[in-house]
């Protein structure tokens, strides 16, 4: 029985395995049938990973939730084509789904609004359309449809493991206290999350490879724990670990070569047909015209007027043509592979990404792979030891515990990226680039969003005169128009309020005049007094007591004034009286009613007679009480 159960368990693991070889991922990708090459798919993978990261930061989601959303997106496109499923929609769905899986729920309405605003952050007019009911309901229905598709595609498998925990546990067991090693290893894990390594190897292999490269980069020897080598702490086999390290080195070397040979940026942009194919495929499973780059929907308008900008795209305008750097550089990269002799006339993708956000490396960009020096597998030496990349990294540490949810701020005006030999590849000064950017910005810069809303700084690669002039002419009229309308509306509101206050003041002045009460009815007088202020009307005429009934006289006297007599502190007792007699006695002895000035003379006779009656009654009561006592 044990053998059969173990066999069934292994078969189930194989059936629901999410790990494939590198050849399987490249050969059997469903996007290949729709004309999307491996390079295109890799570039789009970087786009939706950056988009998920930016939206997650805006929603203040923890790092684990963001990583889970990225893994959901990776697994979805293992079985679905990029050309038939818009990655913006799928990425938004994965964020919403990951927030529920990781017990960090975020309202669907908020996810939709933030994701839509992130997609159209360069075009505030289009981003504000999400507040319209019809646009919002359309996006909501699209996200709910996409959620069902993602759930069925990933087979309702929510068990996702990340390399963060194995990495932290191993560093704690090995006693690694160097913050630089921890930071570089953590950033490596985040970098591999944007590649297919997380679809090829289990998390402990990625954690082990990241720690090894970080130690070699910092020239730190990994210690031995309990008589075992360091990689035993990850429970990994040496042969697969060597394969993981080989792929990591290849990616590092490829990035280093791209940065080592930057190309000039003065060239004409060519539209990227692959991106248009993704959004406009007639066989799309999720049709979302409002999210497509070249949408012809009347709600969005001409795509050239407000081209959709993704989380890692930056718009430049040269010769009246809108083009994003990731698209342009991807087409240039493909052309360079076909024409090696024309490499000097093309611009690489990483040259644009290298100076993104003013040359500053934000926390979620992590330490770029190009900053890692070439690691020789035979010698395992670090070419450059004193490189200052970790200073600009984002994640912070508290003692020995690495906080995966921390978000750091900018850390300086300059960041140097080094290649082979430790030479500086770029030195971007934030002060020198301020003159290139237009003086009026559409987006707001906030430290919490970590440059999510910053203007594109890839203009520095383009012509500093023509490109900046066209960019400024593109931005300034919209901003000035909006400010002008706001000022006009404020003026109208102020004038209307002042006019209303003046009318009210004049009306109160008219109402404040003395108007005889005899000329007004009771309702009119009450209305006048309520509007001008409550004034108690005095009774000037005298009403004779004999003209009033007993109830009327009592009511009048109560209105004219009641004087409370001395307080009776004696204990309450009936004193042998009936209840009615006792109440009458207490009322007469405790309350003294003073008549108004108009009826004092007329009431004096009645009061004297009343006293005589009360005295006689008291005498009778007193005798009866004495008789009862005796």
From Swiss-Prot:
UniProt biased composition (Low complexity): 288-297
Record keyword Chloroplast present: no
GO cellular component, one term: nucleus
Molecular function per GO: cyclin-dependent protein serine/threonine kinase activator activity
Sorted UniProt keywords: Cyclin
Record's keyword annotation contains Coiled coil: no
Highest taxon of source: Eukaryota
Compositionally skewed regions (Polar residues) per UniProt: 421-439
Stored SUPFAM superfamilies: Cyclin-like
Pfam families according to UniProt: Cyclin_N
GO BP term, pick one: positive regulation of transcription by RNA polymerase II
Region span, Disordered: 288-313, 410-439
UniProt similarity note: Belongs to the cyclin family. Cyclin T subfamily.
Protein name, entry field: Cyclin-T1-2
Organism: Oryza sativa subsp. japonica (Rice)
Gene name linked to the record: CYCT1_2
């Amino acid at each position: 029985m044990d053998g059969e159960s173990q066999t069934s368990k292994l078969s189930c693991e194989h059936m629901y395995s999410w790990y494939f070889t590198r050849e399987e991922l490249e050969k059997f990708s469903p996007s290949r049938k729709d004309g999307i090459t491996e390079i295109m798919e890799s570039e789009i993978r970087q786009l939706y990973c950056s988009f998920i990261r930016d939206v997650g930061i805006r929603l203040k989601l923890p790092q684990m939730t963001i990583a889970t959303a990225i893994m959901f997106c990776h697994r979805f496109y293992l079985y679905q084509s990029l050309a038939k499923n818009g990655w913006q929609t799928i990425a938004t769905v994965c964020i919403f789904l990951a927030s529920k899986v990781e017990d960090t729920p975020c309202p669907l309405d908020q996810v939709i609004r933030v994701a839509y605003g992130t997609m159209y952050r360069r075009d505030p007019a289009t981003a504000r359309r999400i507040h319209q009911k019809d646009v919002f309901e359309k996006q909501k229905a699209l996200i709910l449809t996409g959620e069902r598709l993602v759930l069925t595609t990933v087979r309702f498998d929510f068990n996702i493991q990340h390399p963060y925990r194995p990495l932290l546990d191993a560093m704690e067991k090995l006693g690694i206290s160097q913050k630089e090693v921890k930071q570089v290893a953590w950033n490596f894990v985040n970098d591999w999350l944007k590649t297919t390594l997380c679809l090829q190897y289990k998390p402990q292999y990625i954690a082990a490879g990241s720690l090894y490269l970080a130690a070699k980069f910092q020239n730190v020897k990994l210690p031995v724990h309990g008589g075992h080598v360091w990689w035993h702490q990850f429970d990994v086999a040496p042969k697969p670990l060597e394969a993981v390290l080989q792929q990591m080195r290849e990616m590092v070397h490829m990035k280093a070569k791209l940065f080592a040979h930057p190309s000039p940026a003065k060239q004409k942009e060519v539209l990227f047909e692959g991106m248009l194919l993704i959004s406009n495929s007639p066989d799309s499973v999720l049709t979302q015209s409002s999210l497509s780059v070249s949408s012809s929907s009347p709600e969005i308008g001409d795509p050239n007027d407000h081209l959709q900008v993704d989380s890692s795209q930056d718009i430049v305008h040269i010769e009246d043509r809108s083009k994003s750097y990731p698209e342009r550089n991807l087409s240039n990269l493909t052309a360079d592979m076909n024409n090696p002799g024309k490499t000097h006339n093309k611009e690489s993708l990483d040259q644009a990404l290298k100076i993104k956000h003013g040359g500053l490396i934000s926390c979620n960009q992590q330490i770029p792979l190009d900053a890692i020096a070439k690691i020789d597998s035979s010698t395992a030496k670090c070419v450059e030891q004193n490189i200052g990349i970790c200073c600009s990294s984002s994640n912070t540490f508290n003692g020995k515990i690495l906080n995966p949810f921390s978000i750091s701020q900018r850390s300086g005006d300059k960041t140097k990226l080094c290649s082979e030999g430790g030479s500086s590849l770029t030195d971007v000064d934030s002060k020198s680039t301020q003159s290139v950017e237009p003086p009026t910005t559409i987006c707001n810069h906030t430290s919490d969003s970590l440059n999510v809303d910053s203007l594109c700084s890839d203009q520095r690669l383009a012509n500093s005169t023509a490109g900046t002039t066209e960019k400024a002419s593109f931005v300034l009229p919209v901003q000035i128009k909006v400010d002008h309308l706001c000022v006009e509306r404020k003026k109208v509101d102020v004038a209307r309020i002042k006019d209303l206050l003046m009318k009210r003041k004049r009306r109160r002045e008219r109402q404040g005049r003395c108007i005889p009460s005899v000329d007004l009815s009771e309702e009119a007088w009450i209305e006048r007094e309520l509007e001008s202020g409550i004034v108690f009307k005095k009774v000037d005429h005298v009403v004779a007591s004999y003209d009033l009934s007993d109830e009327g006289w009592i009511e009048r006297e109560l209105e004219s004034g009641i004087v409370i007599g001395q307080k009776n502190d004696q204990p309450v007792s009936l004193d042998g009286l009936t209840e009615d007699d006792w109440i009458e006695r207490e009322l007469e002895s405790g309350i003294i009613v003073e008549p108004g000035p108009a009826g004092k003379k007329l009431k004096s006779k009645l009061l004297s007679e009343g006293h005589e009656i009360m005295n006689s009654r008291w005498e009778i009561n007193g005798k009866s009480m004495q008789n009862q006592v005796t």
